[in-house]
């Protein structure tokens, strides 16, 4: 990862490549501007590592400056767009990008898109070992929805909703 320019950061603030969240990472100063995302990182991310999700972080030193959370899930066939539900069982396996956030001090430099790309690479690798039909995102707000639609060929379903699907074939074609 490239160093973020024009930011007053302490010496040694070169950004790490995305790594799995660990107890030694500093979470207390993280502020993406969304209290719910800040609180989830501080209170839930490490607890969820054992069974429910995986969180990957980029750090300046030990301080987390961006994170993405991925997990497995399923959607009902009727709740998926045609391209995803075609020939699918009643419960369609998906990978979920549950949360993605960048500290405000590092925003606007492409780090969010980098985190999404890293998550999609990991999902592409996992799809070679386990079945899944798509990546699912429930965008938190319209700005988040625009971000995901800019970054990849997500499908809105139902139309004009914040529920987004990215067919696994697209993920594998780009990141596999």
Residue ranges and their predicted role:
Residues 1-109, 113-176:
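Non-catalytic substrate-recognition and accessory regions of acyl/acetyltransferase enzymes
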């Amino acid at each position: 990862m490239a160093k973020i320019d024009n930011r007053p950061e302490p010496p040694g603030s070169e950004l790490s490549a995305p790594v799995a969240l660990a107890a030694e990472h500093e979470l207390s100063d993280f502020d993406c501007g969304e209290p719910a995302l800040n609180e989830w990182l501080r209170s839930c991310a490490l607890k969820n590592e054992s069974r429910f999700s995986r969180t990957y972080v980029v750090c300046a030193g030990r301080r987390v400056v961006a994170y993405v959370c991925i997990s497995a899930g399923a959607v009902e066939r009727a709740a998926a767009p045609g391209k995803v539900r075609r020939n699918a069982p009643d419960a369609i396996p998906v990978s979920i990008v549950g949360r993605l956030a960048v500290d405000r001090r590092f925003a606007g430099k492409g780090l969010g898109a980098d985190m999404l790309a890293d998550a999609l690479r990991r999902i592409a690798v996992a799809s070679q070992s386990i079945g899944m039909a798509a990546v699912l995102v429930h965008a938190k707000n319209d700005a988040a929805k625009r971000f995901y639609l800019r970054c990849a060929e997500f499908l809105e379903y139902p139309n004009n909703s914040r529920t987004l699907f990215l067919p696994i074939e697209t993920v594998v074609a780009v990141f596999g």
